[in-house]
A protein has these predicted regions:
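Short, conserved catalytic/metal-binding motifs centered on acidic residues
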Residues: 22, 253, 305, 360, ...
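Terminal interaction-prone segments of large eukaryotic proteins
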Residues: 43-228, 490-740
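Eukaryotic short linear interaction motifs
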Residues: 31, 257-259, 278-281, 298, ...
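Core catalytic machinery and nucleic-acid-binding channels of phosphodiester-processing enzymes
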Residues: 206, 211-229, 235-251, 257-273, ...
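Short coil/turn segments at secondary-structure boundaries
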Residues: 261-265, 283-286, 348, 372-376, ...
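Compact, glycine/acidic-enriched structural inserts
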Residues: 272-315
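N-terminal regions that are enriched for targeting/export leaders
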Residues: 1-64, 78-81, 90
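Domain-level detector for long, ordered catalytic/regulatory cores in large eukaryotic signaling
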Residues: 314-547
Length: 740
């Protein structure tokens, strides 16, 4: 373990040459390190003992990829004593109040389909499942449809069970099929009120209910009747074990694999556990690497990830849960996909916003041509109003329609339609499946290759593999589950545009005055060491997100004597809006969303009134949809990407120490080494070398992390969590609102 730590991980990776140099120097001091080969062998063995696995695959167009097993990563997380105790496995019904974590979001609470919700609760030694009849303490039989937390206790949303006695002495069980979480026909009951599960309920004459209902439950709506088989399929899969519901936040981005300015593009995929409170999940320690490639596109790289997620969300997997000290069945599902605007456009099969006549991935904002963008109708639509200036609800895109449009384009090509007709179809629907278009190009350029043969085979057997894999991802709606991300839309978008516009309009004297005002600005409440005033003014075109955070907070105090009144109004409105957007705690969601919409409209109207050419920047429009993202997921800080962006540096370090023969595999192996070391130092149980017993790290190994701030920092872990209990940490998170 000592040799592995010296060889480094994440940001401190060491080359073989440097390690050998240190080994020789320490040998002079009679300190003997294991050889480099021994260290690498130990890392490989440690991977096997800590559930680490990787999968090699070829993309549909033949690019090799290596993906770290999501199942292995989740086994580590639930077996990790540091992580498991903080995880939420049930959504929390906060009733729109005191929202600060993802487990309180509306999607997790009630917007998953039936088979992807939290499936069961345990009361005593009994397990109760959704869409199964259950008897409660007043002897009535109900059907739970949702399980959730409220006030640190488990609750259920249940509906009435209708029983029809048939002439054959059998019974027909039915429930209403048009019930949602907030329906007046739903009832809230505490978990302790459940008495008997489905298989123990008896009918009036003493016969077991399961023997006379044909194990069927009818869900009836005016339009259809659906037969639900009993018992819940997850009861059979769980085999008496607890089921852990684990939503995931997935992120993808491109970064350079070089330290130099020469661009060496690597597409990477990371994830984090949505059940962790933000104070924990925002630590680098809890960012999980999944895959990277310097040749495959984001959709190619995502294909094996989506495939594994679908398998896991269908069948689950067994692992040890450290918080329960027992084996559990894990049900992982996707909660959201994070990325910048170009990445979101690729994932949602929409056109790149900067050059498109349909620049929004969420709604159907459209201009017929470039000249149409200069019309009043388009400007009104851009800020969410009709031609009379009245606010209107946006015409939202449909994920199903997007998939249909992509397939329609493919079939046009297969029928030999001219290129102009295909391009016209893409423009009409605003849908461009990048993976499918790449496949079309590959077929045209390489008629007789092995890749083309494989594509033709898939067209007959598994045509869905020729399209965006996210179409098939269970529980994912590309247009709803790609929330408006504030780093790229607000800081690196709106604030950057307006600041550059401001600086370009200043004289030399005004710029000097601005520098002086920045220098005299009191930063005692900004939690930053200093303001680089000259840098902010002279290098305004090279600023990064943290610089714009400083600028937007200083703007009300340093800008207003050097700009005209019309710009002052825009900046005042933007400052009000940003002070709302960057709140990490929402006391009342309904009021917050209403205020957010109001401030957004105020800002956009003042902006467009000053210069309507801002409609050429799609990020001003996408701001309109931020309130929808907040209503679905909670405070914007919960889907911020800074923690993932900073992790790009770790990928870069791993790339530098790759042999460059197979970067995807080398980098994946490097992160698996880190994952194994992290898990072992955290005190997770390991599989013995003979694979027949479980071994726990010694207290000396655990103390390397628990009592050593340097090692904690090495792994990206804040030592604060060792000083407080989980409940105290959660309580403190509820009371903090955080500055920008």
């Amino acid at each position: 373990m000592i040799g592995c730590l010296i060889a480094g991980c994440t940001r401190t990776l060491m080359s073989r040459k440097t390690y050998n140099h240190i080994q020789v120097v320490l040998r002079l001091c009679d300190v003997h390190l294991p050889s480099w080969k021994t260290v690498q062998s130990a890392k490989t063995q440690l991977q096997k003992m800590t559930h680490c696995k990787k999968y090699k695959s070829l993309s549909v167009i033949g690019n090799p990829m290596t993906t770290v097993s999501i199942q292995g990563l989740l086994k580590q997380e639930l077996g990790n004593p540091i992580v498991a105790k903080y995880l939420d496995f049930y959504p929390e019904n906060s009733k729109g109040e005191n929202i600060y974590k993802l487990s309180q979001c509306e999607k997790w609470l009630h917007q998953y389909p039936r088979d992807l919700r939290a499936q069961m609760i345990r009361v005593g030694d009994q397990s109760f499942y959704i869409y199964e009849p259950a008897q409660i303490i007043d002897r009535n039989v109900v059907v739970p449809l949702y399980f959730y937390n409220k006030g640190n206790k488990l609750w259920a949303k249940v509906c009435k069970l209708n029983v029809l006695v048939l002439p054959s002495s059998l019974v027909e069980l039915s429930i209403s099929g048009d019930l949602n979480f907030y329906s007046s026909n739903m009832k809230d009951i505490m978990a302790e009120e459940f008495l008997k599960p489905y298989h123990e309920i008896t009918f009036n004459d003493g016969r077991p209910l399961k023997s006379i209902c044909r194990n069927e439950l009818y869900e009836i709506t005016p339009e259809r009747t659906e037969i639900i088989k009993l018992p819940n399929p997850w009861r059979l899969k769980a085999q008496g074990r607890m089921i852990r519901h684990v939503p995931l936040s997935i992120y993808s981005d491109d970064t350079s694999g070089n330290l130099s300015k020469q661009w060496n593009k690597h597409i990477s995929i990371f994830m984090s556990l949505a059940g962790l409170p933000p104070h924990i999940s925002n630590q680098e320690y809890n960012t999980l690497f999944v895959a990277t490639s310097n040749i495959a596109t984001a959709l190619e790289l995502a294909a094996p990830v989506v495939e594994e997620l679908n398998i896991l969300s269908t069948s689950g997997f067994f692992t040890f849960d450290h918080s329960l000290q027992e084996d559990v069945l894990v049900l992982p599902v996707i909660l959201m996909f994070l990325g910048d605007s170009p990445m979101h456009a690729e994932i949602t099969s929409t056109l790149h916003p900067n050059v498109s006549l349909q620049p929004c991935r969420i709604c159907k904002l459209k201009a017929k041509n470039k000249k149409d963008k200069a019309t009043g109708t388009y400007v009104d639509n851009f800020i969410g109003r009709n031609t009379n200036g009245i606010l209107v609800k946006p015409n939202l895109r449909s994920w199903i329609d997007t998939k249909k449009a992509a397939y329609h384009t493919w079939y046009l090509v297969q029928r030999g339609a001219p290129k102009t007709q295909v391009q016209s179809c893409i423009s009409e629907f605003g849908v461009k499946d990048v993976l499918n278009q790449t496949i079309i190009h590959t077929i045209k350029e390489n008629q007789d290759t092995k890749v083309t043969y494989n594509i033709r085979r898939l067209q007959d057997d598994s045509i869905e593999k020729l399209f965006n894999p996210f179409y098939e991802l269970k529980g994912f709606d590309g247009h709803k589950d790609t929330p408006v991300e504030v780093l790229h839309v607000i800081l690196l978008g709106i604030v950057k545009y307006l600041y550059r516009d401001l600086i370009c309009g200043l004289t030399v004297d005004k710029k000097e005055e601005l520098v002086a005002r920045f220098q005299s600005f009191d930063i005692s409440n900004l939690n930053i060491p200093s303001i680089k005033a000259k840098y902010l003014v002279q290098h305004y075109s090279s600023l990064v997100g943290k610089d714009f955070k400083i600028i937007i907070q200083a703007a009300p105090f340093v800008f207003f004597t050097i700009i005209e009144e019309s710009r002052q109004k825009i900046w005042i409105s933007l400052c009000h809006l940003c002070s709302l957007i960057f709140q990490t705690h929402i006391s009342c969601l309904e009021n917050y969303v209403a205020n957010l919409n109001s401030f957004t409209q105020d800002f956009l109207i003042k902006l467009i009134s000053s210069n309507a050419q801002w409609v050429n920047k799609p990020k001003f429009h996408i701001l309109l949809h931020l309130s929808q993202s907040v209503a679905r997921f909670g405070p914007a800080s919960l889907f911020a990407t800074e923690k993932f962006e900073s992790y790009n540096g770790v990928v870069r370090q791993a790339s530098i120490h790759s042999n460059r023969q197979s970067p995807s595999q080398d980098i994946a192996n490097s992160f698996m080494n880190f994952s194994a070391i992290r898990y072992c130092l955290s005190g997770g149980n390991c599989i013995s070398e003979t694979n027949v017993s479980i071994v726990s790290p010694s207290y000396q190994v655990k103390n390397l992390l628990l009592k050593n701030p340097t090692i904690q920092n090495l792994l990206g872990l804040d030592s604060y969590i060792f000083k407080v209990k989980p409940r105290e940490l959660k309580a403190s998170a509820q009371t903090q609102t955080g500055s920008i």
